Amino acid sequence: MLGHNIYEEDDAFNPFADSVSPLNPPKTDQEPSAEGVEEESPNVQASPPKTHIYTSPRKRSVNLKSLPFETLTLDSAPLGPLQFSDAPSMAPENNRLEVGLNTKINPLKGSSPALNADFSANKPWISEVNSFSPSPIGATENPTIPNSEQTVDTLDAASSSAPNFTHTVSSASSQKQGSTSLTDTENQKAHPAAAPQSLTPFYIQVHDPHTVKEITKSHTVYSVSTRLEEHNQPSVSNVTVQRRYNDFAFLYQLLSNNHPGCIIPPIPEKQVVGRFDDEFIEQRRAALEVMLRKISAHPVLRDDYSFKLFLEAETFDPRMTHRTTLIESSSSPLRSGPSTSGLLDSFTSAFHTSGSSKFSEQDPILIEAKDTLDSLETQLKSVYHALLLSIDQRIQFASAIHDFGEAVGNLSLVDLEPTLSSKFDGLSQLQVELRFVQERKVAQDNLTLGTTLEEYIRYVESAKNAFTTRQKLWQTWQSSVQAVSRAKTQLEKCKKQAKSQQKSLPYLEEQYEKYRAKAADLEKEFSESTTLLKRDLSSLTTSRVDDLKASVETWLESAIESQKEIIERWESFLDQ
């Protein structure tokens, strides 16, 4: 720890004790018990954190190749220590959902075998914290749809008004039937959920990036190597495929559509200027590798068909990977029989107007989580903006030191007293050394705090995207409920007609049952997406805050070491 290796005289030193921010809340006298902390009263409104207006500056590119990396003293990097060691795994001890930033973190380190040397390409393996080791949350009962006439009345009544969500996201049908549903607190006490086991990531490596030049435009291709022993193959074998950046972006979009409410590990941002620089390509390669490993560690995403196809297929064609999801299948009318003179046109069109239903979040846990994400994103961007300004000023300071050293060196060449000329020459050499110290500090800031903040911001944006996909699923569900209501109206109207005019009755009954089953499936999937979103939010809070704390400590240690080195060099110069 920082306090042990630098401030040995004060064991209780804490560099973050006096700072109060969303990332470091003030401590309380009482420690949370192992049984969990009682939920706060919903009537008590916490004051929102102070926000700042953020304007994105131009990110300065630092040529890391010109810096003497052999002198870097980083103990860790934002993506993990640069080493040929094992990947750590997370086993959080939280026993309930904690969306806020005051989650207690105590990860347990694990290990996994090293990568196969066949495709290591003599590059260090970048370890990363498994941000998707899910924390247990209270069990939530999925409402059931009984196949009775009561369900028809329920869906008909639900079409006129949106369902009122409770903590357990109970559906409109279960509320209208008067079925008992547990709140979050009661449900957690009645059905305590067992902690899911932490999943080991697949052995994935992104390596050998090379630029493919074309007539119109060029792009970079990456080799993705995977060991198939995690896929229950009879024998261990390595599969290497070629993927470009657009393939990774398309994989992210597929996973987002296939799993509403799931927080997908974010993809690095697109860049137009300097995208073929060696430094930028290496940073993107490392970020893409971490993205794939975190997807493989997610208990839901690792078994996705599109993800397996991305790792194993020779070509990643959108036409091959496209599979109709439940939302897409509900967006088109179910026509399995002949046309019935437009009787179904009045309610099948409801599937194409999913945006007509206005979504209003009623779950207090998700409302608080959404507000926390908005505030957190603003504060993270503010800190990242300030860090970039600090880096820019340090680069200018290093340039000024270099100019001063050259001026003093030229002064030492003048025919002066020999002792004075020697002093000027030593001062000139000292300024050159101090310039390298400042440039090395710039590299350390980028590798530690800068990259971690940027990745954290992308994770927050991915979490907000999970809220959006869940909202689209809710709108599709409400459209299906309206379609069931209209189908029931048409069916009852046909039953009231004369026997000779009821030729379309069997077809209407069949279509009505299909629409009702589809509405039940959408209701169940919406409940599952809510549970998945809460679990991923808890895991995100635990893992990302832990990474940020580690990066801040590493950044502070590097700053102290840089100041010590500067003082030692000045003392050596004075002793000459």
From Swiss-Prot:
A 1,2-diacyl-sn-glycero-3-phospho-(1D-myo-inositol-3-phosphate) binds at residues 244, 270, 284. It is a peripheral membrane protein. Residues 1-60, 156-198 are annotated as: Disordered. The modification Phosphoserine is found at residue 332. GO terms for cellular component: cytoplasm; cytosol; endosome; Golgi apparatus; prospore membrane; retromer complex. Belongs to the sorting nexin family. Residues 200-317 form the PX domain. The gene is vps5. Keywords: Cytoplasm, Golgi apparatus, Membrane, Phosphoprotein, Protein transport, Sporulation, Transport. The PX domain binds phosphatidylinositol 3-phosphate which is necessary for peripheral membrane localization. Residues 156-169 have a biased composition (Polar residues). This is Vacuolar protein sorting-associated protein vps5. SMART domains: PX. GO terms for molecular function: phosphatidylinositol binding. Residues 170-181 have a biased composition (Low complexity). It is found in: Cytoplasm; Golgi apparatus; Membrane. PANTHER family: FI18122P1, SORTING NEXIN. The modification Phosphothreonine is found at residue 55. Signal peptide: none annotated.
